């Protein structure tokens, strides 16, 4: 009986663990601006510690949503990589961000995320603009 109780508790913990979900491009709506998410190079996602998933059509929507919901605890901050056309999600804290007037994003902030810092630097050299890490990006949008 004790083994069954332990197994049940373990199963409950695994079933409730907050996990990211794939974005259904062309179907899912942005939880900030309500536009349909179609751009695989600018999308983003948040997952709360309780497992609720929020999806965004642009990183700037995600950042603004975070600023308006500071009381919510998030377990995952995810963004897509501009250099990839696959639409896969990467940990936002590990990415590099470029704000460039020569590289537009869906909501007009000209904000693009890169999983690889060297590729971000290459785009900066070509397109100009300013590079940010996750925390400096939050500070930039808090102004």
Question: What are the residue ranges of the model-derived segments?
Answer:
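Mature extracytoplasmic domains of secretory-pathway proteins
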Residues: 55-93, 97
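Post-signal-peptide N-terminal segment of Sec-exported extracytoplasmic proteins
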Residues: 31-71
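Sec-dependent signal peptide recognition
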Residues: 1-9
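C-terminal motif of bacterial Sec signal peptides marking the signal peptidase cleavage site
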Residues: 12-15
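Bacterial signal peptide processing site
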Residues: 17-19
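C-terminal partner/receptor-binding element of secreted or periplasmic proteins
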Residues: 115-143
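Short aromatic-glycine-(Arg/Gly/Cys) micro-motifs in beta-strand/loop hairpins
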Residues: 41-47, 93-106
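Short metal-coordination and nucleic-acid-contact micro-motifs, chiefly zinc-binding Cys/His arrays
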Residues: 26
């Amino acid at each position: 009986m004790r083994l069954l109780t332990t197994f049940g508790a373990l199963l409950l913990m695994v079933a409730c663990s907050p996990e990211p979900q794939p974005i259904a491009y062309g179907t899912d709506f942005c939880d900030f601006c309500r536009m349909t998410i179609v751009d695989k190079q600018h999308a983003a996602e948040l997952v709360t510690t309780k497992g609720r998933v929020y999806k965004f059509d642009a990183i700037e929507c995600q950042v603004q949503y975070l600023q308006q919901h500071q009381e919510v605890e998030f377990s995952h901050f995810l963004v897509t990589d501009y250099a990839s056309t696959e639409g896969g999600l990467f940990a936002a804290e590990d990415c590099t961000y470029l704000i460039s007037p020569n590289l537009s994003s869906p909501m007009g902030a000209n904000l693009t995320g890169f999983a690889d810092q060297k590729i971000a630097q290459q785009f900066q050299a070509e397109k100009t603009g300013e590079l940010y890490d996750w925390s400096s990006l939050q500070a930039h949008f808090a102004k």
